[in-house]
Curated annotation (Swiss-Prot):
This is Transcription factor E. The keyword DNA-binding applies. The lineage of its organism: Archaea, Methanobacteriati, Methanobacteriota, Stenosarchaea group, Methanomicrobia. The winged helix domain is involved in binding to DNA in the preinitiation complex. The keyword Transcription regulation applies. Transcription factor that plays a role in the activation of archaeal genes transcribed by RNA polymerase. Facilitates transcription initiation by enhancing TATA-box recognition by TATA-box-binding protein (Tbp), and transcription factor B (Tfb) and RNA polymerase recruitment. Not absolutely required for transcription in vitro, but particularly important in cases where Tbp or Tfb function is not optimal. It dynamically alters the nucleic acid-binding properties of RNA polymerases by stabilizing the initiation complex and destabilizing elongation complexes. Keywords: DNA-binding, Transcription, Transcription regulation. Residues 5-87 form the HTH TFE/IIEalpha-type domain. One of its GO terms (biological process) is regulation of DNA-templated transcription. The gene is tfe. GO terms for molecular function: DNA binding. Monomer. Interaction with RNA polymerase subunits RpoF and RpoE is necessary for Tfe stimulatory transcription activity. Able to interact with Tbp and RNA polymerase in the absence of DNA promoter. Interacts both with the preinitiation and elongation complexes. Belongs to the TFE family. Gene3D superfamilies: Winged helix-like DNA-binding domain superfamily/Winged helix DNA-binding domain. It comes from Methanothrix thermoacetophila (strain DSM 6194 / JCM 14653 / NBRC 101360 / PT) (Methanosaeta thermophila).
Amino acid sequence: MVAVENPIHRAYLLKIVGEEGLRIVEAMPEEEVTDEHLAEITGISLNTVRKSLYLLYEHRLAIYRRKRDPESGWLTYLWKICPESLDSALEAEVRKLINKLNARLRYEKDHVFYACVNGCARFVFEEASENNFTCPFCQGSLEYMENSTIVEVIEERIKELSAALCS
């Protein structure tokens, strides 16, 4: 059985495979196991077990081996969880998030924004200008919006995530 005690690992697995998938992970024995056996011991439908295993495989958190039955010719998939890969998978997720935040930071720094006085939406200067500084949703006026707070928050988040990667 694979115990997932680390709250960060637990949250990550929940994000990937949900509650039932987490139950499947925790029910996995140390040795290889078939998806049918997992469905049997967890009481979770075979389709859900397979979906969860494939999601784990896509994130490199599970591996499988195919074995052909010599009599029937059918393939049997034997699955195994790779809990040692959780940290590297989380690290990859953090790197992706940092890249997205850097792209958002560039966007925020490269544009001037105008916001609807009624809170409908926020527009870049070009869009606001095309609409004569009038909100296309409510016809309210669009006023200049200072985004330095947004920039600071993004920069701080990037700094925190980068520090977490280094530790």
